[in-house]
Amino acid sequence: MTCNVAFIGLGVMGYPMAGYISKAGHNVSVFNRTTTKAEKWIYEHKGKMASTPKEAAEGADFIFTCVGNDEDLRQVTLGENGLFHSAKEGSIYVDNSTVSAEVSRELYNKAKEKGFAFLDAPISGGQSGAEGGILTVMVGGDEEAFKKAEPVIDCYSKKVKLIGQSGSGQLTKMMNQMCIAGVVQGLSEAINFGINAGLDIDKVMETISKGAAQSWQMENRYKTMVEDKFDYGFAVDWMRKDLKIVIEEAKRNGSPVPITEIVDEYYADVQKMGGNRWDSSSLIARLKKKK
């Protein structure tokens, strides 16, 4: 069934995600703060460009957002020209941003007051996952709204799962980022250790990747880490933003996260090296620098 869809936020993730929704045959209206991005998207895909989030959401059955942080999300939803001023009763709003569970719960309640549904649905898989339409989506919210939205979310994902009530999607994404941070630091230490020991890293990785040490990061990032190439994905600035959310939420629910806190400090070191836009595998750079 063809639906009217609004997509707000055409960054490295949102741009291809909106494209997959359009390719599936839905009528897509897009908004992006940088209008040239939206113009480029319109040139490449079927759809129309809106001048504000409010305009994009008018008449939409499903509204999607993919923006940078809590402040950006509040601006495109509750701001003067935010989508909450035009979202129609009975529509479903799916937020793919990685933000705090607190703001997700706030928007869930405000949407409910206005007669439409809200799902927090952060994504994992990076730029390559978005471009390949194979993202993993972790969702928080009401089951009825989820079942209606799932076919549209499927357009850009390989796995979508309703975790629980509002905020559960964001909490799951926090766990995801904690796991990635720890794995990348461990892999960085191991690669640096192997280099210093004079080992053939390709042979080592070919061997240990078939055992218990195997990970997505090992399979997809070890070669670029060895070569000091850090332009393949999720930027350090964004990882630090996510880890800040993790640490703040951990304080709220009483969970000690000592490794996450340490790795966050290591990412701060990478920023001081000028690596703000390097991808998250760049933790190895600070180890090589310490030689």
Residues of each region from the PLM?
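NAD(P)+-binding Rossmann beta1-loop-alpha1 motif at the extreme N-terminus of oxidoreductases
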Residues: 1-65, 91, 96, 127
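Hydrophobic beta-strand scaffold residues
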Residues: 28, 49, 118-119, 160, ...
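Rossmann-fold NAD(P) dinucleotide-binding segment
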Residues: 53-116
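Rossmann-fold dinucleotide-binding core
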Residues: 93, 99-177
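Active-site-proximal catalytic alpha-helix in oxidoreductases
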Residues: 132-133, 137-140, 165-197, 209-220, ...
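Interdomain hinge/lid region at the active-site interface
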Residues: 214-280
